[in-house]
């Protein structure tokens, strides 16, 4: 579960390393596949994103376990997001780490195709 003020890792190559959630869209908390508004807290120099910029992001990994329809629970070691634009396309060209299958059901197919592993 991601709520306002939660700090998350960035799982793409946009140059942002850590972001903070400042708004959850359509609910009070976000889980896998939900879109949130984030502000960049830590970024690499000379990259496409800078500190204090605001972006939309989709949650791809959460520490809180999520129950699937078959009864299985899925959880990860960290909370992570991928930065997206207004058309839900990823801003980066690579995605790092495993991605949950719930993103396929939420129609983030470009992120799923960039991911090295879908769990």
UniProtKB/Swiss-Prot annotation:
Family the UniProt entry places it in: Belongs to the universal ribosomal protein uL14 family.
Organism: Cyanidioschyzon merolae (strain NIES-3377 / 10D) (Unicellular red alga)
Subunit note: Part of the 50S ribosomal subunit.
The protein's role, per its UniProt record: Binds to 23S rRNA.
Lineage, opening ranks: Eukaryota, Rhodophyta, Bangiophyceae, Cyanidiales, Cyanidiaceae
Swiss-Prot/TrEMBL keywords: Chloroplast, Plastid, Ribonucleoprotein, Ribosomal protein, RNA-binding, rRNA-binding
One GO biological process term: translation
InterPro entries: Ribosomal_uL14, Ribosomal_uL14_bac-type, Ribosomal_uL14_CS, Ribosomal_uL14_sf
Pfam families listed in its UniProt record: Ribosomal_L14 (PF00238)
This protein's name: Large ribosomal subunit protein uL14c
One GO location term (cellular component): cytosolic large ribosomal subunit
Keyword match Ligase: no
Entry-linked PROSITE patterns: RIBOSOMAL_L14
Localization (cell): Plastid, Chloroplast
Any one GO molecular-function label of the UniProt entry: structural constituent of ribosome
Keyword Transmembrane helix included in the entry's annotation: no
